[in-house]
Amino acid sequence: MRAAVLREYGEALAVTDLDRPDVAPDGALVAVEACGVCRSDWHAWQGHGEWADDRVPTGQVLGHEPVGEVVAVGDGVDHLRAGDRVVVPFNLGCGTCKRCRNGHGNVCPNGLALGFEADAPGAFAEYVHVPAADYNATAVPDGVGTAAVAALGCRYVTAYHALAHRAEVGPGDWVAVHGCGGVGLSAVQLATAMGARVVAVDVDEAALDAAVDVGAVATVDATEGAVPAAVEAATGGGATVSMDALGRAETCRNSVDCLRARGTHLQVGLTTDAERGEVALPTDELVRWDVDVLGSRGMPPTRYDELLALVESGRVDPGELVGREVSLAEVPDRLAAMTDYETDGVEVVTEF
């Protein structure tokens, strides 16, 4: 099968031929129909994460946002059959531990990160293997398009879990979103669908325009002055919930500083080599104003049905964010384009 492999950090991925994965007794082999290209792939390609002992190994097949058709299942799989169309999370749970059984498979202690570790080769490939397939794979409704499902990837699922499950965003809340890339625009669209009012923050005019297109009621150009003051003015006192969707020190601090009393900061963006996993925050202010700081990773596999139902109903449309469909051969260049934020909306691999 054809696959895109990380050979050297920062060097073009090698698109090459590999053996098709074997099927484990509890696993499923999926023919990949589409796979989103994500900034987390860029972080992996750059070799980020060594400061947290989380560096993706060379030799890794990248890609972690697949949708496709089941072509084979192991003898221990009960709920999937060849021909089923499924979406696969990047945070794979074992399905049997206490966290998985209680709905927290996104932080399974025995879990695997699809496309980020050797035991879970990714989906920039013609085929991908899904372990614990009954637990991890979710059927896709017939009316939902392939590219739209791939766009859910880790951007919509990450934004949805953060907003709905961690911060419990509700009607009337003010939500600030710092960084209007894939995760940020997903958060704008989802928070709007939840009845919240959204302020979008970015340095790029086109990104802010895109945020308005998917529901933002106000925007802040981060190049034009103090972001926290601008958000406070737009919201009449500060955001109820604020998300750092980028992971830079500046966006993290701005997110915390723009909250009203008893607000909630959501950290979903991963840091770069500049921050190396650490950002200084005003802890005394967090205490003084009773502020919550929450991390959020992906989404439990068992809660995909909630998000797919939103998509099927038409309340959320991931297809709005898809800017380009590309081939597997183009993936090396599209990752390189992320270095200077030159991608075109959400980009999805649809030709293998």
Please describe what each predicted stretch is:
Residues V5-D22, R39-A72, V87-V88, C108-D119:
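N-terminal glycine-rich cofactor-binding segment
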